[in-house]
């Protein structure tokens, strides 16, 4: 095959995928390429290759894909059959296209074609097997579809519209909603840059969305875009962030407000959200600091925009300004090259990457009841990958 180098934009990154795609016990290769002599607007080509006895590869089948690049490739192995899901994209279109192929008798045949904004395979009904889940935005309307099969023979397809009106889908997160029940959390952003989260799961043959099915529940998830739904602490439960001004900031203008992040979980009996945790969420700095319980209603913050440093303060309603309040703890995000300089100034390393590190400095007196131990600081700070 003569072609130009390609990159697949998801789990499978190579332009070649070697695996058993027809359940015959032998590996085949899927090759994705474009012809060097053609324009950049041509559709990507997909080729199936079989291994020869001498270790080489022979092209067995070829077709044109439904886009100029491959967005994602997923395989669904049902034992006797394998579904090949290929998502295609094109710079000229907001929509992406998915084709589900089956390779049998030397032919790569399409058994499903559709459009998507986000696609994935997740177990939404707790059956132990993943369903294909398609989230699609058309205009400002958002819908979700599921394609379910346990054997690759009988397929059930379901679709429903969601309540949210969106300019774009900013992300999807899969995880536990409550008591072993998993769901898909869809973050959608409106034209005024407000983010909402829709929750979707399967109950039997029905797509259920607590946020769309209960009046006022979707509105409870409103916050500025950039605050992502996530399992921030790695416990398997997904929480939704909403914000409220820290103590002492309610009378200030919006641009000057420092917000506390309240993490919401869902209670199926109440059919409502409850507050699971409070934190300071530094979106630009890439970290979350969970507030210990004894800090609730007693602490506020002050941010140094020049140094990207946050100082937690003991709230004093009699103080004339935030800056007059007693400091408890400072957290700084800095380039790794500056670590030694901060260490010389009394800061202690908490966490970091190859490029940035997180350090803290305790500035409260030893007798202060709100003073945190080193272990408390470390266990409550979470680095958030972008």
Where are the regions a protein language model picked out?
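Short, small-residue-biased leader/transition segments that mark boundaries at the very start
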Residues: 1-8
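Beta-strand-rich domains and repeat architectures in extracellular enzymes and scaffolds
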Residues: 9-36
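Beta-propeller blade termini
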Residues: 13-21, 68-78, 82-83, 116-124, ...
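Acidic/hydrophobic-patterned starts of short beta strands in beta-sheet-rich repeat architectures
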Residues: 23-33, 77-88, 126-135, 178-188, ...
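Structural motif
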Residues: 38-47, 92-100, 140-149, 192-203, ...
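Beta-propeller fold detector
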Residues: 58-64, 109-115, 156-163, 209-215, ...
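Solenoidal tandem-repeat scaffolds enriched in leucines and small polar residues
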Residues: 102-194, 200
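N-terminal targeting sequences that direct proteins away from the cytosol to non-cytosolic compartments
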Residues: 175-178, 192-196, 206-317, 336-386
């Amino acid at each position: 095959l003569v072609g130009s180098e390609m990159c697949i934009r998801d789990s499978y990154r190579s332009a070649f995928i070697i695996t058993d795609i027809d359940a015959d016990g032998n590996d085949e290769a899927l090759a994705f390429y474009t012809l060097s002599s053609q324009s950049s607007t041509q559709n990507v080509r997909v080729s199936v290759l079989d291994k020869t006895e001498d270790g080489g590869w022979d092209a067995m089948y070829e077709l044109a894909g439904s886009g100029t690049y491959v967005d994602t490739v997923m395989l669904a192995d049902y034992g006797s059959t394998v579904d090949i899901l290929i998502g295609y994209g094109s710079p000229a279109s907001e929509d992406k296209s998915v084709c589900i192929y089956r390779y049998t008798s030397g032919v790569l045949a399409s058994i499903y074609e559709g459009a998507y904004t986000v696609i994935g395979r997740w177990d939404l009904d707790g059956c132990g097997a993943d369903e294909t889940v398609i989230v699609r935005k058309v205009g400002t309307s958002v819908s979700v579809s599921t394609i379910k099969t346990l054997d690759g023979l009988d397929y059930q397809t379901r679709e429903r519209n969601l309540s949210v009106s969106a300019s774009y889908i900013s992300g999807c997160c899969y995880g536990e909603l409550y008591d072993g029940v998993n769901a898909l959390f869809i973050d959608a952003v409106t034209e005024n840059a407000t983010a909402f989260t829709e929750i979707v799961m399967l109950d039997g043959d029905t797509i259920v969305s607590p946020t769309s099915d209960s009046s006022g529940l979707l509105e409870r998830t409103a916050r500025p875009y950039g605050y992502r739904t996530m399992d921030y602490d790695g416990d398997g439960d997904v929480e939704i962030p909403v914000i409220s001004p820290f103590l002492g900031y309610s009378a200030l203008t919006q641009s000057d407000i420092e917000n506390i992040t309240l993490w919401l979980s869902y209670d199926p009996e109440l059919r409502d959200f409850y507050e699971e945790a409070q934190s300071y969420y530094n979106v630009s700095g890439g970290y979350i600091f969970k507030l210990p319980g004894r800090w609730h209603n007693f602490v506020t913050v002050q941010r140094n925009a020049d140094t990207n440093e946050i100082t937690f303060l003991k709230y004093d309603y009699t103080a004339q300004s935030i800056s007059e309040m007693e400091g408890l703890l400072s957290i700084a995000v800095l380039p790794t090259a500056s670590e030694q300089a901060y260490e010389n100034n009394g800061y202690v390393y908490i966490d970091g990457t190859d490029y940035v590190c997180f350090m803290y400095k305790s500035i409260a007196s030893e007798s202060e009841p709100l003073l945190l131990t080193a272990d408390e600081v470390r266990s409550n700070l979470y680095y958030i990958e972008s």
